[in-house]
Amino acid sequence: MINPVTNTQGVSPINTKYAEHVVKNIYPEIKHDYFNESPNIYDKKYISGITRGVAELKQEEFVNEKARRFSYMKTMYSVCPEAFEPISRNEASTPEGSWLTVISGKRPMGQFSVDSLYNPDLHALCELPDICCKIFPKENNDFLYIVVVYRNDSPLGEQRANRFIELYNIKRDIMQELNYELPELKAVKSEMIIAREMGEIFSYMPGEIDSYMKYINNKLSKIE
């Protein structure tokens, strides 16, 4: 069962050169063992040191880049609208598109992945007003972390973020129950069960959700 950490009110920026401090600032309940490990190949883009616990932030790659990204995000930021309209799935098909549609007020919740907890976009996002993140490691992957970004100034924000995590866990449970099936068949069957509601909480257009469900159905019929 996934139990993500949440920064409920956003976080305040901290002035530090130490890599450990910035991660704990956005992910306070991360296991201590994480900092005893050597930086992975993706971490090394942003930090330098023998272990994450003694590593320092790289000035250009993390500090300056985070400042640039935060400045960009502030120009794109909008207060929460009274009502949200459906968006095209294509608008949120990239990590930037996913969080940009949230901070610009187009939808209350989105999801993307990062390959390092030192990703400057992640840290910049967490400092925006009324923008919150739930972070948890992707299962069976040594690098990826899933980030659920949502509007804290909309009741739909955390509600949909929590429902995403519930659906994510449902899909994982189904995959485990179907462990005797081929990997592709497990993936498609579990997707069939959660896909429509997942599309709805991501605010995708109803027609696009219908098209995706038809695609999944066709894919299932070809596999079975």
UniProtKB/Swiss-Prot annotation:
Annotated GO CC locations: extracellular region; host cell nucleus
Chain segments carrying region Interaction with host proteins TAB2, TAB3 and ZRANB3: 49-52
Sections of the chain in a coiled coil: none
Protein residues bound to S-adenosyl-L-methionine: 92, 98, 107, 111, 204, 208
Keyword field contains Metal-binding: no
Main enzyme class: transferase
Record field: catalytic activity: L-cysteinyl-[protein] + S-adenosyl-L-methionine = S-methyl-L-cysteinyl-[protein] + S-adenosyl-L-homocysteine + H(+)
UniProtKB keywords: Host nucleus, Methyltransferase, S-adenosyl-L-methionine, Secreted, Toxin, Transferase, Virulence
Subcellular localization: Secreted; Host nucleus
Any Pfam family matching the protein: NleE
Signal peptide (UniProt feature, chain positions): none
EC numbers, comma separated: 2.1.1.-
Family per record: Belongs to the NleE/OspZ family.
Assembly: Monomer.
Function: Cysteine methyltransferase effector that inhibits host cell NF-kappa-B activation by preventing nuclear translocation of host protein RELA/p65. Acts by mediating cysteine methylation of host proteins TAB2 and TAB3: methylation of a conserved cysteine residue of the RanBP2-type zinc finger (NZF) of TAB2 and TAB3 disrupts zinc-binding, thereby inactivating the ubiquitin chain-binding activity of TAB2 and TAB3, leading to NF-kappa-B inactivation. Also mediates cysteine methylation of host protein ZRANB3, inactivating its ability to bind ubiquitin chains.
NCBIfam families with a match to the protein in the record: NleE_fam_methyl (NF033830)
Name listed for the protein in its UniProt record: Cysteine S-methyltransferase NleE
